[in-house]
């Protein structure tokens, strides 16, 4: 019996993330992108007191990660403010403390996912509001399709995460996906670059906002399974996630060049 060939999925051709000649160059690049992500999170209103953290794995010491110092507002963070934390939760570079919750969650995600360079978590308004629904996002828009079959739900809220055992459970719930909804808490995204992890957090929060608004207005019509899977590969792949962040980088560096200090 003859079979019908499945047409190849059309994916936009985009530039690729840079490749570095030295570890020092790669480390600086990751730290610069990390500082820019904090400034953008502040710009988008993702700050909530001292809550929230974005981490970037060190390119040399891969069980260490760079993170924001505890108690510093996202809008004030510069490259020189970032701290380096080892696998024991000790600050080995920098003179500020680490958020224990950041270590409990992110250290276990980085350990479980050696493919992941960065992880982003914040108590963004729409992300935490949607998390209280105890549901996955539906494929209501093209942008939301980035997460179709690519996010999960961690439905075990027990207060602030201080124990690495709970971090292990969060990492297990995420699996090989790019994001997890922490019920009654917020969103967590990961990526092979800081750019990718930050972009997918930004667009996931907006997708939460979009679905909340759509359901408040009426009964939204979801995208079909077949079309959502195609769109997921088109807008949800790592290279596109990295590329989507580049205009945001250009804007924030021009507006707030001190972040590179």
Model-derived features: positions:
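Flexible, glycine/proline-enriched loop segments at strand-loop-helix junctions
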Residues: 24-28, 92-100, 153-161
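Short HxH-centered metal-ligating active-site micro-motif
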Residues: 86-127, 164-172, 176
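A conserved C-terminal secondary-structure "cap"
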Residues: 2-37, 178-261
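N-terminal low-complexity or amphipathic/hydrophobic leaders
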Residues: 14-88, 247
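Class I SAM-dependent methyltransferase SAM-binding "motif I" and its flanking Rossmann-like core
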Residues: 125-166
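Short glycine-aspartate micro-motif
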Residues: 66, 117-121, 181
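Solvent-exposed alpha-helices and their adjacent loops that cap or buttress functional pockets
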Residues: 46-48, 57-60, 74-77, 110-113, ...
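A contiguous binding-surface segment within folded domains or other stable secondary-structure elements
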Residues: 152-189
């Amino acid at each position: 019996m003859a079979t019908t060939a499945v047409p190849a999925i059309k994916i936009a051709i985009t530039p690729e993330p840079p490749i570095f000649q030295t570890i020092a160059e790669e480390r600086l690049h990751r730290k610069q992108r990390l500082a820019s992500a904090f400034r953008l999170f502040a710009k988008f209103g993702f700050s909530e007191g001292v809550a929230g953290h974005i981490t970037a794995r060190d390119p040399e010491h891969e069980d260490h990660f760079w993170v924001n110092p505890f108690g510093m507002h996202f809008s004030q963070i510069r490259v020189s403010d970032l701290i380096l934390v080892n696998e024991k939760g000790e600050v080995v570079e920098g003179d500020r403390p680490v958020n224990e919750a950041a270590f409990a969650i992110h250290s276990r995600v980085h350990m479980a996912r050696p493919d992941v360079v960065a992880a982003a978590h914040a108590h963004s308004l729409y992300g935490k509001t949607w998390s209280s629904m105890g549901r996955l996002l539906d494929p209501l828009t093209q942008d939301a399709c980035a997460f179709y079959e690519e996010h999960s739900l961690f439905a075990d809220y027990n207060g602030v995460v201080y124990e690495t055992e709970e971090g292990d459970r969060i990492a297990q719930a995420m699996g090989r996906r790019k994001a997890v909804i922490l019920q009654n808490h917020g969103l967590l995204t990961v990526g092979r670059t800081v750019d990718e992890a930050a972009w997918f957090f930004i667009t996931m929060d907006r997708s939460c906002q979009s679905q909340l608004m759509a359901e408040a207005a009426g009964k939204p019509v979801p995208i079909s399974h077949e079309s959502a899977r195609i769109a997921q590969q088109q807008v949800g792949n790592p290279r596109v996630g990295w590329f989507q962040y580049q205009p945001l980088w250009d804007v924030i560096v021009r507006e707030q060049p001190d972040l590179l200090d």
